[in-house]
Design a protein with these regions (language model features):
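Hydrophobic h-region of N-terminal signal peptides that target proteins for export
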Residues: 10-20
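Acidic, His- and aromatic-enriched active-site or binding-groove loops in soluble protein domains
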Residues: 123-136, 176-214, 218
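Short, structured active-site-proximal loop/turn typified by the sulfatase FGly-forming signature C/S-X-P-X-R
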Residues: 40-111
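Substrate-binding rim/cap in mid-to-C-terminal beta-strand-loop elements of soluble/periplasmic
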Residues: 118-124, 300-347
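Active-site His/acidic residue clusters
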Residues: 172-174, 220-266
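Structural recognition of the beta-strand scaffold that forms the well-ordered cores
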Residues: 29-33, 40-41, 96-99, 120-122, ...
């Protein structure tokens, strides 16, 4: 174990191993990402500095935007922006990363943009070779590929994402994972009436970005997969929060964050309605990187933009204590997410990948003591 992560394990006072499968209620894990959604919006809601045309580039009238997303306190603002996160998830799980309360979460890849972040998140360790979003096929197997190689999970692992680069991040040629990403039409063969409409939208909609399909377009085939294929390990990547920030449209950042929260709620409700998922599913919700925080800096991210390394992580499921917003706890890092996904399924990812960071053990056991 490297010294870089060893102190985290000691502070959490639990072994950095997969939990015994017999002691866990979780049988399904969903890792959900909203690309580039800042911790500031997660914990404080709409940013007053950006609720205007000058800094936030808003096209909506300021009065209308304030009516929808502005409230007197950070707690009220975050709840109106992200109601599912701050009602259901906060009541049933844990939310980490509020720096104002001594809860720190950050990346360790040294770049603070998407491909290096997803590699760190999904493989459990950073890779300095991955220094571009155009890097190409990932040389590092992800925890999803590893889990798909286990007999009990083979063929029960899927990826749905708006960004076409996920086909490289998950290296589909090597992993053979089903990765639905970008503008590839989601259906094949005989289509239902609803599927035919969505297929036409995929093929005929004007693309603001050739690499990113709209979040809403992803949601329908995602929900179909839940009903039809009984996926047990699922990755879901939404992208509009990052895209609209790069476009300098803070009003649409807020709208897309609000819709992201709705999509997560919709996915949770759909899974809880299925007997195979009900009360046996854990959600891990996070982001790949932060952003800057000034009147111009919020649009961008990268190691040169201070604050881009800061992220947030939320966890909800049958094996996570309902502690809500965490405060004054040890720092967690993005690399710990991979082993955490595996640990909820009773698997020790670090035994197979010693370079991986340990799981976030404090979210793994209702019986563990301390806060």
């Amino acid at each position: 174990m490297s010294m870089k992560y060893g102190w985290l394990v000691l502070l959490f006072a639990l072994p950095a191993l997969g939990a015994p499968a017999g002691s866990l209620q979780t049988r399904n894990v969903v890792l959900i990402v909203s690309d580039g959604l800042r911790w500031q919006e997660i914990f404080s809601g709409a940013d007053p500095l950006l609720m205007n045309e000058k800094n936030g580039g808003i096209w909506a009238t300021e009065a209308d935007l304030r009516k929808k997303f502005w409230r007197a306190t950070p707690e009220e603002r975050r709840k109106v922006l992200l109601p599912f996160l701050w009602t259901t998830v906060a009541a049933r799980g844990q939310i980490l990363g509020n720096q104002t309360k001594g809860s720190l979460a950050h990346v360790t890849n040294g770049f603070a943009f998407s491909y290096p972040g997803y590699n760190e998140m999904l493989t459990g360790h950073p890779d300095r070779r991955i220094d571009s979003n155009e890097f190409g096929p990932n040389p590092n197997p992800t925890v999803f590929e590893w889990l798909n190689g286990l007999p009990d999970l083979h063929g029960r692992v899927s990826v749905f994402a708006t960004w076409s680069t996920f086909k490289d991040i998950f290296n589909v040629a090597r992993s053979q994972l089903p990765v639905h990403a970008g503008w590839d039409p989601p259906y094949a063969g005989q289509l239902t009436a609803e599927q035919a409409i969505l297929d036409r939208l995929y093929r005929t909609t004007t693309k603001l970005d050739d690499d990113d399909v709209y979040d809403a377009f992803l949601q329908i085939p995602l929900l179909d997969a839940i009903h039809k294929h009984q996926v047990r390990v699922l990755f879901v990547g939404y992208g509009e929060t990052d895209n609209w920030a790069h476009s300098g449209r803070y009003d649409l950042v807020l709208e897309s964050a609000h819709l992201f929260d709705h999509f997560v709620e919709e996915l949770w409700s759909a899974m809880q309605a299925e007997p195979a998922y009900r009360d046996h599913t854990t959600f891990i919700i996070t982001t790949d990187h932060g952003r800057g925080s000034g009147p111009l800096e919020w649009k961008e991210h990268g190691i040169e933009e201070r604050g881009s390394e800061n992220i947030w992580i939320a966890v909800m499921g049958p094996d996570t204590r309902p502690l809500g917003e965490r405060a004054h706890i040890p720092t967690v890092v993005q690399a710990q997410i991979a082993a955490t996904v595996a640990a909820f399924l009773g698997e020790d990812y670090r035994r197979a990948v010693p370079a991986a960071a340990p799981p976030i053990t404090d979210v793994l056991s209702r019986a563990s003591a301390g806060d």
